[in-house]
Amino acid sequence: MEKHNHYFYVLKCADGSLYAGYTNDLQKRLMTHNSGKGAKYTRARRPVELYYHECFATKREAMQQEYRFKTWTRKKKDLYIEEMRIEKEATHEHTKKL
């Protein structure tokens, strides 16, 4: 079993576009993108901000989600992120009540 967390993440670029990727260290990867040493796509669209992320137990699961996300339209991506945020918020509120 892998011992690290694996993240699928979405960045919002300065031009409003989205960039999706995989990492096992969110903060380090965000700094890499903003330093201009990240993906070629984000170099010309800095600064970028962490817009959304999901944590997975395995690299494979995180990369599968990245692949799925990249096949969707922008509208579907925005809807997915909105729905997942609402779901996480509801889960958090439910946990606080327990």
From Swiss-Prot:
Which named protein is this? Answer: UPF0213 protein BPUM_0019
The protein's superkingdom reads: Bacteria
Q: Which family does it belong to?
A: Belongs to the UPF0213 family.
Q: Which InterPro entries match?
A: GIY-YIG_endonuc (IPR000305), GIY-YIG_endonuc_sf (IPR035901), UPF0213_domain (IPR050190)
Q: Which organism is it from?
A: Bacillus pumilus (strain SAFR-032)
Report the residue ranges that make up the GIY-YIG domain in this protein: 4-79
